[in-house]
Amino acid sequence: MFYVYVLRSESDSGFYIDFSTNLRARLRQHQDGESFATSYRGPWKLIYYEAYTEREDAEGREKFLKSGAGRRFLRAQLRHYLRVKGFASRGLIVLS
């Protein structure tokens, strides 16, 4: 399986999107600072993921979620989470 996932930084409230074949191991790498892109922004919380059987589908979905339309989709999909965490009122969602 291929997993597309969204993490939220608990230090700066930023978001990070990526994909992996082993979601648990990859999350552990993010938490342990083993990923250059996220090492300085942890700890991280997994807030959303999708599973795909084909790599190409996961890569396409990752690319979409990083686009403007993808950010709008995530904003709608995570509406309750973002409202509870105070993002909706500020109109803020930052996706790396």
Where are these predicted regions, by residue range?
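GIY-YIG nuclease catalytic motif and its immediate N-terminal context
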Residues: 1-45, 49-52, 56-66, 71, ...
